[in-house]
């Protein structure tokens, strides 16, 4: 079992988030930490992550993301709670096109990251 698991930009690509996080949780030691970074399911995330990143900027191949698989923070928290993962912190992550930098933010409308502890 592991002390820390990083599920970074993965859950928005899996077919069954509940099963994926169940299996991830089973691999985590008690009191271990799981970090989950993903995309919120909002109109803004559709515009930025799919239209912007795939079609306009062409950072990713078209079809990389399926908006139906994006996960709202409240839904992620519930799934994690059902798998013995307690939310410790949740923040938005915002990318600045001008500075080419990411920053932690209270705005979780596109990208966000959660820190969960195995109980």
PLM segments and residue spans:
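Acceptor-substrate binding/catalytic loop of class I
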Residues: 38, 55-75
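Short Asp/Glu-rich motifs
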Residues: 46-47, 98-100
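A conserved catalytic-core signature of glycosyltransferases
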Residues: 46-47, 66, 71, 111
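Residue-level marker for beta-strand->alpha-helix junctions and adjacent short loops that shape enzyme
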Residues: 41, 95-97
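Short alpha-helix
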Residues: 67-90
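Core SAM-dependent methyltransferase catalytic element
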Residues: 100-119
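Conserved SAM-binding loop
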Residues: 1-46, 73-76, 114-118
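Short, flexible, mixed-charge acidic loops at enzyme active sites
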Residues: 45-55
């Amino acid at each position: 079992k592991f002390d820390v698991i990083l599920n970074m930009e993965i859950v928005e690509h899996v077919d069954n988030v509940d099963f994926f996080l169940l299996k991830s949780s089973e691999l985590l030691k008690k009191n271990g930490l799981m970090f989950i970074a993903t995309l919120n399911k909002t109109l803004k995330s559709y515009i930025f992550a799919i239209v912007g990143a795939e079609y306009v900027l062409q950072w990713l191949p078209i079809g990389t993301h399926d908006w139906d698989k994006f996960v709202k923070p409240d839904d992620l928290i519930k799934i994690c709670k059902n798998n013995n993962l307690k939310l410790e912190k949740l923040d938005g992550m915002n990318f600045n096109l001008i500075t080419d930098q990411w920053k932690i933010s209270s705005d979780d409308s596109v990208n966000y990251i959660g820190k969960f502890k195995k109980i």
